[in-house]
Amino acid sequence: MLSVPKSYTNGKMDQVVFQKQRNRLNQCFFKFKNQTKYIQFRLSEEQYNKLKISGETYGLSPNLYAKKLAQKSHLKKPYLEHDQAKSLLLELSKQGSQFKSASFRKLLDEHQLLASYSKPGYPYDNAVTEVFFKYLKQREINRRTYHSIQEVQLSCFEYIEQFYNNYNPHSANNGLTPNQKEENYFKKNIAHLTETDIVDRLLKGSPALRVGYQLYQDFLYAVKERDYVSFEELLTNNIMLPEGYQTILRTFQKFLPQIKNALQQSYSNGPLECLNNHIKVLKRNAYGFRSFYNFKLRIMIRHGNALIFN
């Protein structure tokens, strides 16, 4: 099991231990891609991106998968998520005193985490994050006064979604904005797929979705063939499905007598329900009719039974 050295005493020992720490990422953010199923990276930048709201200090902390704002106590949240996901979490930080402290190293060891430390005076590991926060503060944060963390979250969300992703080009994207780059990627890699290929890819990546999709198709086939026996078997043989599916199955169980009648009898109220739905749509749209006669006439024309009386 990989971990940082276990030395929790303060003083000169800390400096000796951390001289041996190396930059595990070395700007290769996907170097562990083939070794672990889940990889998470956290960048510790609170010491440079603090914000005071109503006398309380908050840290602006980025995540490579989702840019969110959190309080300083947010450190423990990714650790708890890491414990549940059984994934490899790399804590990328600078060699500040708060990240060399015994308590911080002890926290890493308790959750079996790795630390990757940038070299002193070497800003390139966090260059992207530094630039992002620089312009975030210049263009948005420093121009406003906030009274709650919710206001900050909304402000940053609007900046990222409405401006940064749509109007901020990057040289790394050949002068394209993030949204344009993403759109080009999907056009190049996804557009050629058929609907069947897309469904197959989705089902291949999620076993639970695959089981649920197959159950859905089985129900459709049973209804199409009017096979009540198969329909009832599907309700009793899928007790191990996730809770989301169990809700639907319980609804089917509740109305099972009515479903049985619908599958076994030759008549159906489907046409009547269809007619009522069309009437509701016509009524909702109104079509500008102000008299009941014109409204009734429009309904009859829609269904091909119009009789015009003088």
From Swiss-Prot:
This is ATP-dependent protease. InterPro entries: Integrase_cat-core, RNaseH-like_sf, RNaseH_sf, Transposase_DDE, Transposase_IS3/IS150/IS904. Residues 24-186 form the Integrase catalytic domain. Its EC number is 3.4.21.-. The keyword Protease applies. GO terms for molecular function: nucleic acid binding; peptidase activity. Gene3D superfamilies: Ribonuclease H-like superfamily/Ribonuclease H (3.30.420.10). GO terms for biological process: DNA integration; proteolysis. Keywords: Hydrolase, Plasmid, Protease. Pfam families: DDE_Tnp_ISL3 (PF01610), rve_3 (PF13683).
